Amino acid sequence: MTHPGILFMRALSHLPLGAVRGLGTLLGRLLFVLARSRRRVALINLRLAYPQWSEAERVALARRNFVYFAQAFLDRSWLWHADPDRVRQRLRITGAVDDLTREGAVVMFAPHFYGMDAGGSAVMQQIDRPACTIYSTQPNPALDEWMQAGRQRFGDATLLSRTEGVKPIVRALREGKMLYLLPDMDLGPTEAVFVPFYGVPTATVPSLSRFAKLGHARVVPVVTRLTDFGYEVKVHPAWPDYPSADATADAALMNQRLQGYIDEMPEQYYWVHKRFKTRPPGEASFY
């Protein structure tokens, strides 16, 4: 993202939502044609996750997936630049909100659906409680500054650098901050365990249970869906059986429950990421 790109996003924030989404539809269709490497990744992921589908069904879902990807990206225009009242009107929090507001430390399990930034903004704008999330610095300084400002726009939000390690995160939890955690990516073999995800042994970092244990926190899933009015941010009830004494079993349970959330809206999950990239020793790459 360059400075002209950021100016474009600021200008886009003044358009009606339908116009922004329409541009996102066009951009997504274009990306599906031009971004061949990411299209290939998405289709491989879908073959692994949904082998029972026909190839035509997977291609059709991948097309919709690219549209949602582009729409969510352009939605950052109004999410990070529009009038706060207009943002609030487009973000609807539903479900077990009391599990976020009642006393005690909270780790929000926020899977990588395309609405993840909207979910974070909704929580910070509408839940009166400080929160933090883990942030990876972007190589482009202008993009990095823009993303940091956007993600800290509302409420008492703190971005913790991934390079700082565990201690600042645990300290924040023990100080009463909620943690908005997105642990469902392939970050390589370091600290990962191989547990099933759609029946495939998948490198999974057991950070959800780890932070819940160290921070004496309950785990509350927060799943965000793009809708016609903007976004629905659904707060699921806190998991009563999590974490356990077994970090590997916890990682497997997280993936199992994540599959349930994905199956409700597979077209909005982050399939363009190489989720199955890291393989057990001796296994060939899927990609």
Label the model's feature ranges:
Residues M1-A110, Y114-G115, E145-A149:
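Membrane-anchoring hydrophobic helices of lipid-metabolizing enzymes
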Residues R40, D117-A118, D144-E145, V166-K167, ...:
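Residue-level marker for well-ordered alpha-helical positions
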